[in-house]
UniProtKB/Swiss-Prot annotation:
L-citrulline binds at residues 95, 131, 135, 183, 267, 279. L-aspartate binds at residues 127, 131-132. It catalyses: L-citrulline + L-aspartate + ATP = 2-(N(omega)-L-arginino)succinate + AMP + diphosphate + H(+). Homotetramer. Keywords: Amino-acid biosynthesis, Arginine biosynthesis, ATP-binding, Cytoplasm, Ligase, Nucleotide-binding. GO terms for cellular component: cytoplasm. This is Argininosuccinate synthase.
Length: 418
Protein backbone atom coordinates (compact mmCIF):
# COMPACT_ATOMS: atom_id res chain seq x y z
CA UNK A 1 0.00 0.00 0.00
CA UNK A 2 1.23 3.49 -0.86
CA UNK A 3 2.02 5.61 2.18
CA UNK A 4 -0.29 8.56 2.80
CA UNK A 5 1.26 12.01 2.54
CA UNK A 6 -1.92 14.06 2.81
CA UNK A 7 -1.44 17.80 2.40
CA UNK A 8 -5.09 18.70 3.02
CA UNK A 9 -8.06 17.39 4.92
CA UNK A 10 -10.63 18.86 2.53
CA UNK A 11 -13.41 16.67 1.18
CA UNK A 12 -11.99 15.94 -2.26
CA UNK A 13 -12.42 13.56 -5.16
CA UNK A 14 -9.74 12.42 -7.61
CA UNK A 15 -10.76 12.10 -11.27
CA UNK A 16 -8.92 10.13 -13.95
CA UNK A 17 -8.79 12.96 -16.50
CA UNK A 18 -8.12 12.52 -20.23
CA UNK A 19 -8.69 16.10 -21.35
CA UNK A 20 -11.63 15.19 -23.60
CA UNK A 21 -15.26 16.27 -23.42
CA UNK A 22 -16.37 13.43 -21.13
CA UNK A 23 -13.92 14.04 -18.30
CA UNK A 24 -13.85 17.83 -18.75
CA UNK A 25 -17.59 17.99 -18.13
CA UNK A 26 -17.23 15.44 -15.34
CA UNK A 27 -15.16 17.89 -13.25
CA UNK A 28 -18.01 20.35 -12.68
CA UNK A 29 -20.67 17.63 -12.85
CA UNK A 30 -19.05 15.64 -10.06
CA UNK A 31 -18.62 18.79 -7.96
CA UNK A 32 -22.31 19.61 -8.38
CA UNK A 33 -23.56 16.08 -7.77
CA UNK A 34 -21.25 15.05 -4.92
CA UNK A 35 -20.29 18.34 -3.30
CA UNK A 36 -16.61 17.38 -3.50
CA UNK A 37 -13.77 19.43 -4.95
CA UNK A 38 -12.18 17.63 -7.89
CA UNK A 39 -8.48 16.88 -8.39
CA UNK A 40 -7.77 15.96 -12.04
CA UNK A 41 -5.12 13.28 -12.68
CA UNK A 42 -3.59 12.76 -16.13
CA UNK A 43 -0.85 10.37 -17.22
CA UNK A 44 1.18 10.20 -20.40
CA UNK A 45 1.58 6.50 -21.22
CA UNK A 46 2.59 7.15 -24.81
CA UNK A 47 -0.87 7.86 -26.19
CA UNK A 48 0.27 10.95 -28.09
CA UNK A 49 -1.97 13.96 -28.68
CA UNK A 50 -1.97 17.05 -26.50
CA UNK A 51 0.80 17.96 -24.08
CA UNK A 52 0.38 17.36 -20.37
CA UNK A 53 0.60 21.11 -19.75
CA UNK A 54 -2.30 21.77 -22.13
CA UNK A 55 -4.37 19.09 -20.42
CA UNK A 56 -3.47 20.46 -17.00
CA UNK A 57 -4.57 23.99 -17.87
CA UNK A 58 -7.85 22.73 -19.34
CA UNK A 59 -8.59 20.76 -16.16
CA UNK A 60 -8.04 23.86 -14.03
CA UNK A 61 -10.16 25.98 -16.38
CA UNK A 62 -12.98 23.45 -16.11
CA UNK A 63 -13.03 23.74 -12.32
CA UNK A 64 -10.46 21.32 -10.93
CA UNK A 65 -8.90 22.59 -7.70
CA UNK A 66 -5.66 20.75 -8.47
CA UNK A 67 -4.20 19.03 -11.53
CA UNK A 68 -1.76 16.13 -11.09
CA UNK A 69 0.04 15.28 -14.34
CA UNK A 70 2.76 12.67 -14.82
CA UNK A 71 4.95 11.63 -17.74
CA UNK A 72 4.72 7.90 -17.02
CA UNK A 73 6.02 6.60 -20.34
CA UNK A 74 9.25 5.11 -19.01
CA UNK A 75 7.53 3.73 -15.92
CA UNK A 76 4.88 2.12 -18.12
CA UNK A 77 7.45 0.62 -20.50
CA UNK A 78 9.86 -0.58 -17.79
CA UNK A 79 7.47 -1.96 -15.19
CA UNK A 80 4.39 -2.95 -17.16
CA UNK A 81 5.18 -3.55 -20.84
CA UNK A 82 8.33 -5.50 -20.00
CA UNK A 83 6.40 -7.79 -17.65
CA UNK A 84 3.94 -8.42 -20.47
CA UNK A 85 6.82 -9.09 -22.87
CA UNK A 86 8.51 -11.56 -20.53
CA UNK A 87 5.16 -13.33 -20.20
CA UNK A 88 4.57 -13.26 -23.99
CA UNK A 89 1.18 -11.92 -22.93
CA UNK A 90 -1.55 -12.62 -25.49
CA UNK A 91 -5.07 -12.88 -24.09
CA UNK A 92 -6.94 -15.69 -25.88
CA UNK A 93 -3.74 -16.20 -27.86
CA UNK A 94 -4.19 -12.95 -29.79
CA UNK A 95 -4.55 -9.74 -27.77
CA UNK A 96 -1.37 -8.26 -26.19
CA UNK A 97 -3.24 -6.57 -23.30
CA UNK A 98 -2.92 -3.04 -24.66
CA UNK A 99 -5.42 -1.45 -22.26
CA UNK A 100 -5.29 -4.03 -19.49
CA UNK A 101 -1.67 -3.37 -18.50
CA UNK A 102 -2.10 0.42 -18.37
CA UNK A 103 -4.97 0.39 -15.85
CA UNK A 104 -2.94 -0.76 -12.82
CA UNK A 105 -0.37 2.00 -13.45
CA UNK A 106 -3.06 4.67 -13.79
CA UNK A 107 -4.74 3.32 -10.65
CA UNK A 108 -1.48 3.58 -8.71
CA UNK A 109 -1.15 7.26 -9.57
CA UNK A 110 -4.82 7.89 -8.81
CA UNK A 111 -4.28 6.48 -5.33
CA UNK A 112 -1.06 8.46 -4.91
CA UNK A 113 -2.91 11.66 -5.84
CA UNK A 114 -5.75 10.79 -3.45
CA UNK A 115 -3.22 10.47 -0.63
CA UNK A 116 -1.36 13.62 -1.63
CA UNK A 117 -4.44 15.83 -1.94
CA UNK A 118 -6.60 14.39 0.81
CA UNK A 119 -9.28 12.72 -1.31
CA UNK A 120 -11.50 9.89 -0.11
CA UNK A 121 -13.03 9.00 -3.50
CA UNK A 122 -11.67 8.19 -6.95
CA UNK A 123 -13.70 8.61 -10.13
CA UNK A 124 -13.13 7.08 -13.56
CA UNK A 125 -15.00 7.45 -16.84
CA UNK A 126 -15.81 3.81 -17.51
CA UNK A 127 -19.20 2.46 -18.50
CA UNK A 128 -21.00 -0.24 -16.55
CA UNK A 129 -20.48 -2.95 -19.17
CA UNK A 130 -16.75 -2.80 -19.86
CA UNK A 131 -13.66 -4.41 -18.37
CA UNK A 132 -11.95 -1.20 -17.30
CA UNK A 133 -14.37 -0.36 -14.49
CA UNK A 134 -13.34 -3.64 -12.87
CA UNK A 135 -9.64 -3.08 -13.51
CA UNK A 136 -9.65 0.39 -12.00
CA UNK A 137 -11.72 -0.42 -8.95
CA UNK A 138 -10.06 -3.75 -8.13
CA UNK A 139 -6.62 -2.14 -8.56
CA UNK A 140 -7.57 0.82 -6.37
CA UNK A 141 -8.95 -1.49 -3.67
CA UNK A 142 -5.79 -3.61 -3.85
CA UNK A 143 -3.61 -0.56 -3.15
CA UNK A 144 -5.84 1.22 -0.63
CA UNK A 145 -9.06 -0.56 0.43
CA UNK A 146 -10.31 2.56 2.28
CA UNK A 147 -10.86 4.57 -0.90
CA UNK A 148 -14.25 4.69 -2.61
CA UNK A 149 -14.67 4.58 -6.40
CA UNK A 150 -17.45 5.95 -8.61
CA UNK A 151 -18.15 6.40 -12.32
CA UNK A 152 -20.20 9.43 -13.45
CA UNK A 153 -21.36 7.50 -16.53
CA UNK A 154 -22.35 4.38 -14.62
CA UNK A 155 -23.43 5.86 -11.28
CA UNK A 156 -24.54 9.45 -12.00
CA UNK A 157 -26.27 9.12 -15.42
CA UNK A 158 -23.74 11.29 -17.26
CA UNK A 159 -24.66 10.57 -20.90
CA UNK A 160 -23.31 12.34 -24.00
CA UNK A 161 -26.44 14.49 -24.34
CA UNK A 162 -26.25 15.49 -20.68
CA UNK A 163 -22.56 16.36 -21.13
CA UNK A 164 -23.18 18.73 -24.03
CA UNK A 165 -26.10 20.46 -22.33
CA UNK A 166 -24.17 20.75 -19.06
CA UNK A 167 -21.13 22.24 -20.82
CA UNK A 168 -23.27 24.90 -22.53
CA UNK A 169 -25.20 25.74 -19.37
CA UNK A 170 -22.04 26.17 -17.31
CA UNK A 171 -20.07 27.84 -20.15
CA UNK A 172 -17.22 25.37 -19.79
CA UNK A 173 -14.15 26.17 -21.95
CA UNK A 174 -14.57 23.14 -24.19
CA UNK A 175 -14.54 23.12 -27.98
CA UNK A 176 -16.61 20.20 -29.19
CA UNK A 177 -14.96 18.53 -32.15
CA UNK A 178 -16.49 16.01 -34.53
CA UNK A 179 -16.92 12.84 -32.54
CA UNK A 180 -15.19 9.73 -33.85
CA UNK A 181 -17.57 6.84 -34.56
CA UNK A 182 -15.19 4.63 -32.58
CA UNK A 183 -14.19 4.30 -28.96
CA UNK A 184 -10.39 4.41 -28.92
CA UNK A 185 -7.83 3.75 -26.21
CA UNK A 186 -4.15 3.92 -27.00
CA UNK A 187 -0.72 3.91 -25.43
CA UNK A 188 2.80 3.04 -26.49
CA UNK A 189 2.05 -0.72 -26.28
CA UNK A 190 -0.81 -0.46 -28.78
CA UNK A 191 -4.21 0.86 -29.75
CA UNK A 192 -7.73 -0.47 -29.15
CA UNK A 193 -10.68 0.39 -31.44
CA UNK A 194 -14.31 -0.58 -30.81
CA UNK A 195 -18.02 0.39 -31.14
CA UNK A 196 -19.65 2.17 -34.07
CA UNK A 197 -20.23 0.01 -37.13
CA UNK A 198 -17.67 -2.47 -35.78
CA UNK A 199 -20.32 -3.73 -33.36
CA UNK A 200 -21.71 -5.75 -36.28
CA UNK A 201 -19.08 -8.51 -36.47
CA UNK A 202 -19.77 -9.00 -40.19
CA UNK A 203 -18.61 -5.47 -41.03
CA UNK A 204 -15.00 -5.32 -42.09
CA UNK A 205 -12.72 -2.59 -40.72
CA UNK A 206 -12.09 0.42 -42.94
CA UNK A 207 -8.75 2.14 -43.35
CA UNK A 208 -9.79 4.99 -41.03
CA UNK A 209 -9.90 2.48 -38.16
CA UNK A 210 -6.12 2.32 -38.19
CA UNK A 211 -3.49 4.79 -37.06
CA UNK A 212 -0.46 2.85 -35.81
CA UNK A 213 -0.18 0.60 -38.89
CA UNK A 214 -0.07 1.05 -42.65
CA UNK A 215 -1.89 -1.25 -45.05
CA UNK A 216 0.02 -4.57 -45.14
CA UNK A 217 -1.26 -5.18 -48.68
CA UNK A 218 0.97 -2.36 -49.95
CA UNK A 219 4.17 -2.67 -47.91
CA UNK A 220 7.45 -0.84 -48.45
CA UNK A 221 10.64 -2.80 -49.09
CA UNK A 222 11.25 -5.49 -46.46
CA UNK A 223 12.98 -4.35 -43.28
CA UNK A 224 15.58 -6.56 -41.56
CA UNK A 225 16.09 -5.88 -37.86
CA UNK A 226 18.31 -7.43 -35.17
CA UNK A 227 17.04 -7.18 -31.59
CA UNK A 228 19.34 -7.99 -28.68
CA UNK A 229 17.81 -9.08 -25.38
CA UNK A 230 19.33 -9.27 -21.93
CA UNK A 231 17.40 -11.43 -19.46
CA UNK A 232 14.24 -11.03 -21.49
CA UNK A 233 14.46 -7.26 -22.02
CA UNK A 234 15.40 -5.64 -25.37
CA UNK A 235 18.61 -3.65 -24.91
CA UNK A 236 19.81 -3.06 -28.48
CA UNK A 237 18.27 -2.69 -31.93
CA UNK A 238 20.64 -3.05 -34.87
CA UNK A 239 23.55 -2.55 -32.48
CA UNK A 240 22.26 0.68 -30.93
CA UNK A 241 21.49 0.81 -27.20
CA UNK A 242 17.81 1.30 -26.41
CA UNK A 243 15.67 1.66 -23.31
CA UNK A 244 12.47 -0.41 -23.16
CA UNK A 245 10.48 2.67 -24.20
CA UNK A 246 12.78 3.35 -27.13
CA UNK A 247 12.62 -0.29 -28.21
CA UNK A 248 8.82 -0.24 -28.25
CA UNK A 249 8.69 3.10 -30.07
CA UNK A 250 11.17 2.03 -32.75
CA UNK A 251 9.40 -1.27 -33.35
CA UNK A 252 6.06 0.55 -33.47
CA UNK A 253 7.47 2.68 -36.25
CA UNK A 254 9.20 -0.07 -38.23
CA UNK A 255 6.68 -2.87 -37.75
CA UNK A 256 3.79 -0.43 -38.12
CA UNK A 257 5.10 0.68 -41.52
CA UNK A 258 4.79 -2.97 -42.61
CA UNK A 259 1.24 -3.38 -41.30
CA UNK A 260 2.30 -5.78 -38.54
CA UNK A 261 0.13 -6.16 -35.45
CA UNK A 262 -3.40 -5.70 -36.80
CA UNK A 263 -5.84 -7.82 -34.79
CA UNK A 264 -9.59 -8.33 -35.32
CA UNK A 265 -11.40 -10.66 -32.92
CA UNK A 266 -14.48 -11.53 -30.93
CA UNK A 267 -13.27 -11.26 -27.35
CA UNK A 268 -14.65 -12.72 -24.13
CA UNK A 269 -14.98 -9.81 -21.73
CA UNK A 270 -14.53 -10.14 -18.00
CA UNK A 271 -18.11 -8.98 -17.40
CA UNK A 272 -19.49 -11.97 -19.30
CA UNK A 273 -20.31 -10.61 -22.75
CA UNK A 274 -18.55 -11.05 -26.07
CA UNK A 275 -17.36 -7.95 -27.88
CA UNK A 276 -15.85 -7.23 -31.28
CA UNK A 277 -12.45 -5.57 -30.91
CA UNK A 278 -9.81 -4.21 -33.24
CA UNK A 279 -6.25 -3.72 -32.04
CA UNK A 280 -3.03 -2.35 -33.46
CA UNK A 281 0.11 -3.39 -31.64
CA UNK A 282 3.02 -3.43 -34.10
CA UNK A 283 5.82 -3.03 -31.56
CA UNK A 284 4.30 -5.43 -29.05
CA UNK A 285 3.66 -8.16 -31.63
CA UNK A 286 7.15 -7.86 -33.16
CA UNK A 287 8.90 -7.86 -29.78
CA UNK A 288 6.86 -10.79 -28.45
CA UNK A 289 7.61 -12.76 -31.63
CA UNK A 290 11.34 -12.17 -31.14
CA UNK A 291 11.22 -12.90 -27.41
CA UNK A 292 9.36 -16.18 -27.92
CA UNK A 293 11.96 -17.37 -30.40
CA UNK A 294 14.80 -16.55 -28.02
CA UNK A 295 13.01 -18.53 -25.31
CA UNK A 296 12.83 -21.45 -27.75
CA UNK A 297 16.62 -21.42 -27.72
CA UNK A 298 17.27 -20.75 -24.05
CA UNK A 299 14.61 -22.50 -21.95
CA UNK A 300 14.87 -26.15 -20.93
CA UNK A 301 12.11 -28.36 -22.37
CA UNK A 302 9.98 -28.94 -19.27
CA UNK A 303 10.57 -25.39 -18.01
CA UNK A 304 9.42 -24.10 -21.39
CA UNK A 305 6.30 -26.27 -21.36
CA UNK A 306 5.34 -25.01 -17.92
CA UNK A 307 6.08 -21.41 -18.87
CA UNK A 308 3.77 -21.57 -21.88
CA UNK A 309 0.97 -22.60 -19.52
CA UNK A 310 1.96 -19.87 -17.04
CA UNK A 311 2.07 -17.25 -19.82
CA UNK A 312 -1.51 -18.08 -20.81
CA UNK A 313 -2.72 -17.90 -17.21
CA UNK A 314 -0.79 -14.64 -16.59
CA UNK A 315 -2.53 -12.99 -19.54
CA UNK A 316 -5.92 -14.15 -18.27
CA UNK A 317 -5.28 -12.86 -14.76
CA UNK A 318 -4.08 -9.46 -15.95
CA UNK A 319 -7.00 -9.16 -18.37
CA UNK A 320 -9.29 -10.02 -15.45
CA UNK A 321 -8.09 -7.13 -13.25
CA UNK A 322 -5.72 -9.23 -11.12
CA UNK A 323 -2.44 -7.32 -11.67
CA UNK A 324 -1.88 -6.84 -7.93
CA UNK A 325 -3.28 -10.22 -6.84
CA UNK A 326 -1.18 -12.79 -4.93
CA UNK A 327 -1.63 -15.22 -7.83
CA UNK A 328 -0.16 -12.79 -10.36
CA UNK A 329 2.72 -11.89 -8.05
CA UNK A 330 3.58 -15.58 -7.70
CA UNK A 331 3.49 -16.06 -11.47
CA UNK A 332 5.72 -12.99 -11.85
CA UNK A 333 8.33 -14.67 -9.65
CA UNK A 334 8.32 -17.81 -11.80
CA UNK A 335 8.46 -15.86 -15.06
CA UNK A 336 11.29 -13.64 -13.83
CA UNK A 337 13.32 -16.70 -12.84
CA UNK A 338 12.95 -18.16 -16.34
CA UNK A 339 14.46 -15.04 -17.90
CA UNK A 340 17.94 -15.28 -16.37
CA UNK A 341 19.29 -17.06 -19.47
CA UNK A 342 17.04 -15.39 -22.07
CA UNK A 343 19.82 -13.28 -23.55
CA UNK A 344 20.96 -13.09 -27.15
CA UNK A 345 20.06 -11.75 -30.58
CA UNK A 346 17.10 -12.36 -32.86
CA UNK A 347 17.10 -11.36 -36.52
CA UNK A 348 13.72 -10.73 -38.12
CA UNK A 349 12.41 -9.61 -41.48
CA UNK A 350 9.44 -7.26 -41.26
CA UNK A 351 7.30 -7.23 -44.38
CA UNK A 352 3.70 -7.26 -45.50
CA UNK A 353 2.06 -7.74 -42.10
CA UNK A 354 4.47 -10.41 -40.86
CA UNK A 355 7.48 -10.48 -38.55
CA UNK A 356 9.48 -13.55 -39.58
CA UNK A 357 12.46 -14.74 -37.54
CA UNK A 358 15.41 -15.61 -39.80
CA UNK A 359 18.23 -15.98 -37.28
CA UNK A 360 18.99 -16.44 -33.61
CA UNK A 361 22.16 -16.63 -31.51
CA UNK A 362 22.85 -16.72 -27.80
CA UNK A 363 25.75 -17.62 -25.54
CA UNK A 364 23.22 -19.19 -23.16
CA UNK A 365 21.33 -21.15 -25.83
CA UNK A 366 20.62 -24.83 -25.20
CA UNK A 367 20.86 -25.51 -28.92
CA UNK A 368 24.01 -27.62 -29.44
CA UNK A 369 25.09 -27.86 -33.07
CA UNK A 370 27.16 -30.97 -32.45
CA UNK A 371 24.15 -32.76 -31.00
CA UNK A 372 21.69 -31.48 -33.61
CA UNK A 373 23.70 -31.99 -36.81
CA UNK A 374 23.26 -35.02 -39.08
CA UNK A 375 26.72 -34.51 -40.57
CA UNK A 376 29.90 -36.40 -39.65
CA UNK A 377 30.58 -34.12 -36.68
CA UNK A 378 27.55 -35.54 -34.89
CA UNK A 379 28.29 -36.15 -31.19
CA UNK A 380 24.89 -37.71 -30.42
CA UNK A 381 25.16 -41.45 -29.72
CA UNK A 382 22.24 -42.78 -31.74
CA UNK A 383 22.61 -46.26 -30.22
CA UNK A 384 21.48 -44.80 -26.89
CA UNK A 385 18.01 -44.42 -28.37
CA UNK A 386 17.40 -48.18 -28.26
CA UNK A 387 17.38 -48.33 -24.47
CA UNK A 388 15.51 -45.03 -24.23
CA UNK A 389 12.70 -46.31 -26.46
CA UNK A 390 12.44 -49.55 -24.45
CA UNK A 391 11.98 -47.69 -21.18
CA UNK A 392 9.85 -44.87 -22.62
CA UNK A 393 7.51 -47.29 -24.38
CA UNK A 394 7.20 -49.73 -21.46
CA UNK A 395 3.87 -48.36 -20.09
CA UNK A 396 2.32 -48.52 -23.57
CA UNK A 397 3.48 -52.12 -24.09
CA UNK A 398 2.14 -53.25 -20.71
CA UNK A 399 -1.23 -51.56 -21.34
CA UNK A 400 -1.43 -53.03 -24.85
CA UNK A 401 -0.79 -56.53 -23.49
CA UNK A 402 -3.69 -56.10 -21.05
CA UNK A 403 -6.00 -54.92 -23.86
CA UNK A 404 -5.13 -57.99 -25.94
CA UNK A 405 -5.74 -60.28 -22.94
CA UNK A 406 -9.29 -58.94 -22.54
CA UNK A 407 -10.05 -58.78 -26.26
CA UNK A 408 -9.73 -55.02 -26.56
CA UNK A 409 -6.56 -54.81 -28.60
CA UNK A 410 -6.24 -52.42 -31.52
CA UNK A 411 -7.60 -54.03 -34.66
CA UNK A 412 -5.26 -54.21 -37.62
CA UNK A 413 -7.03 -54.58 -41.00
CA UNK A 414 -6.13 -57.71 -42.91
CA UNK A 415 -5.69 -58.00 -46.66
CA UNK A 416 -5.68 -54.22 -46.99
CA UNK A 417 -3.43 -54.42 -50.06
CA UNK A 418 -5.13 -55.79 -53.17
Amino acid sequence: MLERETMSDQNRLVLAYSGGLDTSVAISYLKERTGKDVVAVSLDVGQGGESLETIKQRALACGAVEAYVVDARDEFANEYCMKALKANAMYEGVYPLVSAISRPLISKHLVRAAHQFGADTISHGCTGKGNDQVRFEVSIASIDPTLKAISPIRDLSLTRDVEIAFAKEHKLPIVQTEKSPFSIDQNVWGRAIETGFLEDPWNGPTKDCYSYTDDPAFPPVEDEVVIEFKQGVPVKIDGHDVTPLQAIEEMNRRAGAQGIGRIDLIEDRLVGIKSRELYEAPGAVALITAHQELENCCLEREQHRIKRDIDKRWAELVYDAQWFSPATQSLNAFIEDTQKYVSGEIRMVLHGGRAVVTGRRSDSSLYDYNLATYDSGDSFDQKSSNGFIDIYGLPSRVAAARDVKFGNGIEVPENSVE
